[in-house]
Swiss-Prot record:
Cited PANTHER family: PYRIDOXAL 5'-PHOSPHATE SYNTHASE SUBUNIT SNO, PYRIDOXAL 5'-PHOSPHATE SYNTHASE SUBUNIT SNO1-RELATED
Tissues where the protein occurs: Strongly expressed in roots, stems, leaves and flowers.
NCBIfam families: PLP_synth_Pdx2
Species the sequence originates in: Arabidopsis thaliana
UniProt entry keywords in alphabetical sequence: Cytoplasm, Glutamine amidotransferase, Hydrolase, Lyase, Pyridoxal phosphate
Keyword Cytoplasm: yes
Extra remark: In plants, synthesis of vitamin B6 does not involve deoxyxylulose 5-phosphate but utilizes intermediates from the pentose phosphate pathway and from glycolysis.
Catalyzed reaction equations: aldehydo-D-ribose 5-phosphate + D-glyceraldehyde 3-phosphate + L-glutamine = pyridoxal 5'-phosphate + L-glutamate + phosphate + 3 H2O + H(+); L-glutamine + H2O = L-glutamate + NH4(+)
Full protein name: Probable pyridoxal 5'-phosphate synthase subunit PDX2
Region feature (Disordered): 225-255
């Protein structure tokens, strides 16, 4: 298995190092044709506007969208979450191009500026169930985004409480409002939808590799599913062309 890491800007080296600790090869991706050589892709944290401009300059967006549509596993961290979202608010004037595919609305820099970056322990029940370890994960939030709402097919993996004076989002008016703020509410910071995984924080900046392990297993499951589907299709075609021979049970053709 080879995992690609988009290497335009940001913490791509840290992701590759985390993969290496798990015995998985990570390769830097800077050109569209390099996506053909990898099983899955990580879009790292960084400065999302800069990353988008570089991706546009290298004409990467069409290839990235096709990679997602093909069902290839993609994990976005921080800026990568913004890339994968279908909708984004709080962007700079003119906005930025998105890859899309994740049915959610994300708020860029929801938690504030660089000096408001922080670390916090977040509950991660599904991660703990699959990977073991502590019930919490140390999230590193650097100018971090947050997911404001999700579609019905999106699974929420982690959320984080925000204080009562934090500005909230109203999806009905597509505006930022605080008039209906609750004493305490939660925003979503990790999600999964099909072949897409996204975290608002930076797992690559910690020694805890459980999120990377989770993504590797997710990649293997998707690859095995695709291989199984392909095998059944090949067997089915063979039976159709065999004419009057009796139908045979589906058998694995790759050992």
């Amino acid at each position: 298995m080879t995992v690609g890491v988009l290497a335009l800007q940001g913490s791509f080296n840290e992701h590759i190092a985390a993969l290496r600790r798990l015995g998985v090869q990570g390769v830097e991706i800077r050109k569209a044709d390099q996506l053909l050589t990898v099983s899955s892709l990580i879009i790292p944290g960084g400065e999302s506007t800069t990353m988008a401009k570089l991706a546009e300059y290298h004409n990467l967006f069409p290839a990235l969208r096709e990679f997602v549509k093909m069902g290839k596993p993609v994990w976005g961290t921080c800026a990568g979450l913004i890339f994968l979202a279908d909708r984004a608010v709080g962007q700079k004037e003119g906005g930025q191009e998105l890859v899309g595919g994740l049915d959610c609305t994300v708020h860029r820099n929801f938690f504030g500026s660089q000096i408001q970056s922080f670390e916090a322990d977040i509950l991660v029940p599904q991660l703990t169930s699959q990977e073991g370890g502590p019930e919490t994960y140390r999230g590193v939030f650097i100018r971090a985004p947050a997911v404001l709402d999700v579609g019905p097919d999106v699974e929420v993996l982690a959320d984080y409480p925000v204080p009562s004076n934090k500005v909230l989002y109203s999806s009905s008016t597509v505006q930022i409002q605080e008039e209906d703020a609750l004493p305490e509410t939660k925003v979503i910071v990790a999600v999964k939808q099909g072949n897409l995984l996204a975290t608002a924080f930076h797992p690559e900046l910690t020694a805890d590799t459980r999120w990377h392990s989770y993504f590797i297993k997710m990649t293997k499951e998707i690859e095995q599913g695709a291989s199984s589907s392909s095998s059944k299709t090949i067997v089915s075609v063979g039976e159709t062309s065999a004419g009057p021979e009796p139908a045979k049970p589906d058998l694995p053709i790759f050992q």
